[in-house]
Amino acid sequence: MFSWVSKDARRKKEPELFQTVSEGLRQLYAQKLLPLEEHYRFHEFHSPALEDADFDNKPMVLLVGQYSTGKTTFIRHLIEQDFPGMRIGPEPTTDSFIAVMHGPTEGVVPGNALVVDPRRPFRKLNAFGNAFLNRFMCAQLPNPVLDSISIIDTPGILSGEKQRISRGYDFAAVLEWFAERVDRIILLFDAHKLDISDEFSEVIKALKNHEDKIRVVLNKADQIETQQLMRVYGALMWSLGKIINTPEVVRVYIGSFWSHPLLIPDNRKLFEAEEQDLFKDIQSLPRNAALRKLNDLIKRARLAKVHAYIISSLKKEMPNVFGKESKKKELVNNLGEIYQKIEREHQISPGDFPNLRKMQELLQTQDFSKFQALKPKLLDTVDDMLANDIARLMVMVRQEESLMPAQVVKGGAFDGTMNGPFGHGYGEGAGEGIDDVEWVVGKDKPTYDEIFYTLSPVNGKITGANAKKEMVKSKLPNTVLGKIWKLADVDRDGLLDDEEFALANHLIKVKLEGHELPADLPPHLVPPSKRRHE
């Protein structure tokens, strides 16, 4: 009796089983979110339907900036190789969107061929028409960096209404399409001629729903002196604060991202540290790709739910027979009030609603009679996905991340910063003396010995209490001094001999010079008499 009820209940209770996060996202989207999107014509208002390639593609990095800020040179610097279609110069050179991707041989795939390839995540770009597709291509080449990531080069953004109109396609809309699908958006600025044109401001505003993906690079910083660089950095932060209306400060990397000698080498250490941080951020993308796709699907589901409430509310307000056109105009003009009503009734955050002005423009061309009434079952399915399925996928994301190395991207400029004497921080701080035959602490040991013998050593060793009296003079916090003690007490007897005391003072000096302490004592810092214990 009532077997259909028990079957339905059983089906609801049984969790979906997925082999990978990508497969899980693909199935959840197709089975639970896509029906809601199609029912309320989501794709006509916001974003085209997702395809399999959107869930399986490699992480993508989108480069955006005004002309001659070094976008193409930045890619050349990363992959250490010229790519097909590459043009570099002081004038606006890159006039196309170029997807730089891995391929068995060097070559160019034109836009019209690219958007019919089901293996590439670009099929929905055909909606932007031939004017765009003629300015879109894929440069493919065998390169180890491109094994892990793909990079999208964009045309330089110009100033003035004429250039915006003459493109023949909606540049900001294309960038917004890419922004939804990429893992990182890098905005490049030229430190030598800092200027944010009106079109660039509009582009940055179009990316406002993706602040978590945005990083800023202040490029060509070696062309100006330190004092000027501080002023330029301040001006950039002030300008960005006016455009990106968020309380969080956007991360800005300062440097000169090309392989030529630095023109003004005063800030070399700063540039090296910033480059290392940026490279680490890019190298983490493959590891975090599944989490990014999961996050984007959640954002899309929340927007689809709000969209369903908006469309169903408009349908509910429309008359059945007379006065449809006048009512439509009234509803479009009063859309802000409908937003507020939905916000109150369904406890939805204001940040989940689509842009009011853009939505009003899109609604003016729609036939409201084709809109659908509210269908709670579709919304319940999406709520169930967000509450249960996504939580299970989150566990799988962590499992997949734990199996991947922290830095997956290899080759190109990334190899130059990894190991060897030119790796970041090599031979500095605790790494000083790593290649020396003599113990690096030995050169300062006579000075430390003078202090050591004033601390009443017994049988050649001083107690922790006596060592503490001297160590606290450094004014370092007890937590740091405790770590130094642990590293210096190599034989773990709770006492320090003359070599261990010298080592403790060397580590204090390392910390006072602004370097980090190692988690474990490096082999080259182990005192000579203790090396038999190692």
UniProtKB/Swiss-Prot annotation:
GO MF entry, a single one: calcium ion binding
EH domain segment(s): 444-532
Location of the Dynamin-type G domain: 55-286
Binding positions for Ca(2+) per the UniProt entry: 489, 491, 493, 500
Domain EF-hand: 476-511
Localization annotation: Recycling endosome membrane; Early endosome membrane; Cell membrane; Cell projection, Cilium membrane
Top-rank taxon: Eukaryota
Residues that bear Phosphoserine: 456
Gene3D superfamilies per record: 1.10.268.20, EF-hand, P-loop containing nucleotide triphosphate hydrolases
Ribonucleoprotein in keyword set: no
UniProt feature coiled coil, ranges: 198-227
Region of interest called G1 motif, as start-end residue ranges on this chain: 65-72
Chain positions covered by the region annotation G5 motif: 243
Key words, A-Z: Acetylation, ATP-binding, Calcium, Cell membrane, Cell projection, Cilium, Cilium biogenesis/degradation, Coiled coil, Endosome, Membrane, Metal-binding, Nucleotide-binding, Phosphoprotein, Protein transport, Transport
Record-listed ATP binding positions: 65-72, 220, 258
SUPFAM superfamilies, alphabetized: EF-hand (SSF47473), P-loop containing nucleoside triphosphate hydrolases (SSF52540)
Membrane topology reported for the UniProt record: Peripheral membrane protein
Region of interest (G4 motif), ranges: 219-222
Notes concerning its domains: The EH domain interacts with Asn-Pro-Phe (NPF) motifs of target proteins.
Function: ATP- and membrane-binding protein that controls membrane reorganization/tubulation upon ATP hydrolysis. Acts in early endocytic membrane fusion and membrane trafficking of recycling endosomes. Recruited to endosomal membranes upon nerve growth factor stimulation, indirectly regulates neurite outgrowth. Plays a role in myoblast fusion. Involved in the unidirectional retrograde dendritic transport of endocytosed BACE1 and in efficient sorting of BACE1 to axons implicating a function in neuronal APP processing.
Subunit (UniProt): Homooligomer, and heterooligomer with EHD2, EHD3 and EHD4, ATP-binding is required for heterooligomerization. Interacts (via EH domain) with MICALL1 (via NPF1 motif); the interaction is direct and recruits EHD1 to membranes. Interacts with RAB35; the interaction is indirect through MICALL1 and recruits EHD1 to membranes. Interacts (via EH domain) with PACSIN2 (via NPF motifs); regulates localization to tubular recycling endosome membranes. Interacts with PACSIN1. Interacts with RAB8A. Interacts with FER1L5 (via second C2 domain). Interacts with MYOF. Interacts with ZFYVE20.
Name of the protein in question: EH domain-containing protein 1
Gene: EHD1
